[in-house]
Amino acid sequence: MESFLFTSESVNEGHPDKLCDQVSDAILDACLEQDPESKVACETCTKTNMVMVFGEITTKATVNYEKIVRDTCRGIGFTSPDVGLDADHCKVLVNIEQQSPDIAQGVHGHLSKKPEEIGAGDQGHMFGYATDETPELMPLTHVLATKLGAKLTEVRKNNTCPWLRPDGKTQVTVEYRNEGGAMVPVRVHTVLISTQHDETVTNEQIAKDLKEHVIKPVIPAQYMDDDTIFHLNPSGRFVIGGPHGDAGLTGRKIIIDTYGGWGAHGGGAFSGKDPTKVDRSGAYVVRQAAKSVVASGLARRCIVQVSYAIGVPEPLSVFVDTYKTGKIPDKDILALIKKNFDFRPGMIAINLDLKRGGNFRYQKTAAYGHFGRDDADFTWETVKILKPKA
């Protein structure tokens, strides 16, 4: 049977774009914690010695934006200029305005509408995806790239590899077989890690530590063989990193946030957006729908699309494709999805408890992926068992 190669990448929490996602979601958490009806569209950008938050926020919450920025950067590990940013001494710029009253009246009638009447915060289309190739019902390439990034951060923070610095990227290539539309991983073909490091460490030490402390604990032995290729800091030097190395911006890592290039993406980013923004809530509910189809044994692989018009509660369209892996026809699966899931934004927020912030609820989503996580706060990962009519 013919095989093919597919690749997914990830970046860890010290990457400048991911720093921005985490700041935006930390601000969302702070607003929702005090005022669950907060309307938040918060962007962040960063460059050497500077973090700026800007956007539209309407909330009754009292939020110290500067403190949130500094706390988030410090928590990631940006505590001195030589690691890429100094959380306590960098410039913090804030340019936050209120949500446009035009949007407010169209979406939630200035809070006068019932939940089922709340319109979508914008137009757009979102995709949810699931596959039976991993226990998380996520693509293996994406799962491994993401877990390598998380492990890099873990061994940095617990001092297993004290030479590590916060910024880093991973990439995994897997050889697959196509089994009647289902994706079956055969082996890991290539592992790539580029991580920021201090001045003292040699490239030999970097490669040895990454294999021992990052790759070996993450990638199951069954997928590795003598032909697996490793590229470990292939550029030869990565001392300058974080915002000092590259500018960062919220919403620049939308494939890493989702399915690693599998499925499809409507283009809307997640971080810094409250649940009336269907870019986020719509994508969460279609992940739940696709995952439920696969977990219920109705298909081995599934993609679901939903689309919206601004101010209109009901979705314009819902689409499903099981890549010819469905146990029943796709049209019957679509009927089950429509019966079991409410795609109106106000109802998604209630059913998935999306107005609850605080406790790093959204900030956690902003690094290492929004899907396939085993965490009670990720309510959209809860499966509904779908039963076709006998």
Swiss-Prot record:
Intracellular or extracellular location(s): Cytoplasm
Binding residue positions for K(+): 43
Pfam families: S-AdoMet_synt_C (PF02773), S-AdoMet_synt_M (PF02772), S-AdoMet_synt_N (PF00438)
Binding residue positions for ATP: 15, 167-169, 235-238, 246, 252-253, 269, 273, 277
E.C. code: 2.5.1.6
Sequence intervals crossing the membrane: none
Binding site for L-methionine: 56, 99, 246, 277
GO cellular component: cytoplasm
Keyword Magnesium belongs to the record: yes
Annotated binding of Mg(2+), by residue: 9
UniProt record similarity statement: Belongs to the AdoMet synthase family.
Quaternary organization: Homotetramer.
Protein name: S-adenosylmethionine synthase 2
